[in-house]
UniProtKB/Swiss-Prot annotation:
Cellular localization per UniProt: Nucleus; Cytoplasm; Cytoplasm, Stress granule
Biological process according to GO: cellular response to singlet oxygen; leaf senescence; regulation of DNA-templated transcription; regulation of leaf senescence; response to photooxidative stress
Keyword annotations of the record: Cytoplasm, Nucleus, Stress response
Origin species: Arabidopsis thaliana (Mouse-ear cress)
Cytoplasm among keywords: yes
UniProt-listed InterPro entries: MBS1/2-like (IPR045230)
Annotated region described as Disordered, given as residue ranges: 1-46, 64-104
Compositional bias per record (Basic and acidic residues), positions renumbered to this chain: 36-46, 73-82
UniProt-recorded name of the protein: Protein METHYLENE BLUE SENSITIVITY 2
Biased composition range(s): Basic residues: 1-11
Disruption phenotype: Plants lacking both MBS1 and MBS2 exhibit premature leaf senescence.
Amino acid sequence: MTGKAKPKKHTAKELQAKADAALTNRGGGKAGLADRTGKEKGGHAKYECPHCKITVPDLKTMQIHHESKHPKLTYEEPRNLHEALAAPAESSKPKPGIRGSLKK
């Protein structure tokens, strides 16, 4: 009589790939850029903690973060990053489109 076939468990390569995908910061690419930084969807990077530079979407979350991470410091309302970044200063020198120097 033959035995019942055992299903194969995950291979070491699969487990390593899964751990690598979970633990490596891959960036978001262009797909999530508007959601991470843009105004049109609200964006997730609206406010920045002045002490640890973490970004949060709203003032209530900032207050919760401040109470838990910086309890000994006084809470002051942070500035909105979108308003601060809305009008970047114009530089007099144009930037190259490709890495390297400007063509003369």
